[in-house]
Amino acid sequence: TTNGTFTTLYSFYGSSDGGFPYAGVIQAADGNFYGTTGDDGQLGNGTVFKITTNGILTTLHSFAGGSDGSFPSAGLIQASDGNLYGTTAYGGTYNDGTVFQITTNGALTTLISFNGTNGANPQAALVEGTDDNLYGTTQNGGPMDYGVIFRLTVPSLVPTPAFSAPTLLPNGTIALAWSTVAGQTYQLQSVTNLASTNWVNLGSPILANSAVTTTSDVIGSNSQRFYRVVLSTP
């Protein structure tokens, strides 16, 4: 407390609850604290945990050391979508570590497995940029095996593109505009019948540099055409 009162909220046993919490904890929007242990847990590869301000600890995930990763030495972040994101130093498809997403209820998704070429053994926390991407570093890997700085696009963090009203131009084309996030890449697609699932790409992917992106399309002999925009991931 501010007057110097020290209280131990929880002591790890090094068993199913985990052990060696190298990183700190974060307080999420729900008021609880979340963190990782670098070792132990039910499967011996570290854990993600939740702890209340009263010291009640819940293990949200015990890493198995397979595709879910192992030995998370870094802390977590809570991104703007409300989910928690973190890294494991090892495990994953190539045993070079992972980036993972986990809900506050403990549902874990591996977003990427490092393979050495794109980096290896991340041991620091991620940062969510103002562009809604996640940024981080790896200790090893990359062309010279001295580590990399990486950016990871998580589609759920990027707002869904929203079209403005189209404008019919006098030369037989239609002007299209939609909301974008600068730095993200979008692909315009179309179909002539909404019953079809075969959406066709129109032109090359477009790298947005502002909050609104505009382009045009030739209507041609089509009596109707439907458009959509999808976010292109790396």
Question: Where would I find each of the regions flagged by the language model?
Answer:
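Short, composition-biased motifs enriched in small/polar/acidic residues
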Residues: 154-234
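Extracellular beta-propeller repeat domains
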Residues: 1-163, 168-173
